[in-house]
Swiss-Prot record:
Gene from which the chain derives: pyrE
UniProt name for this protein: Orotate phosphoribosyltransferase
Key word Transmembrane helix present: no
GO BP terms, alphabetized: 'de novo' UMP biosynthetic process; pyrimidine nucleobase biosynthetic process
Pathways involved: Pyrimidine metabolism; UMP biosynthesis via de novo pathway; UMP from orotate: step 1/2
Species per Swiss-Prot/TrEMBL record: Lactococcus lactis subsp. cremoris (strain SK11)
Amino acid sequence: MSISKAIAADLLEIKAVSLSPSQPFTWASGIKSPIYTDNRVTLAYPEVRSQIEGAFAELIKAEFPEVEVIAGTATAGIPHGAIIADYLKLPFAYIRSKPKDHGAGNQVEGRVAKGQKMVVVEDLISTGGSVLEAVAAAEREGADVLGVVAIFTYELEKANSKFAESGVKLATLTNYSELIEIAKETGYVTKEELELLKKFKENQETWQA
């Protein structure tokens, strides 16, 4: 089994990802979805956590070999980013969703030199808006952002478009397509539910259970 499928299987097993095609979830954006993800759950499982961080380290070495600093997004990207930085023996920083309203007013916390090559760590890619804002904040501070890595992506067209428009490279450990394939192989979903899950990928904006 590929590492991508192995991680997808782990996410299902520990219920970091929940699938409910017949009784969909409502995201904060208002989108009705057959899937809900809380990757913070992975931190509670040492073996899963270790596999994720090791896979992240290998992914970063392969896709962004020039990296000089790892940055996590607040808050979900911080623990993963810190562990990855430790794996790679690199400096770590984190990026707030907005600047502090007191003190120095920092949005990027840590020591990041001008022109330092950075990889930003996020746990989940939904529409991509928040992590691309974090990238912009890091670039305003002088970082040279090589790209973004994440555990999982819903593969939403909106996110794909935003990353393409911004020119920011995205690499993920696993994705929606791999996850529903594993769900099919393991009998996690019925054939009817699988069809609903496939339709969600085809058009998330108009999907209905």
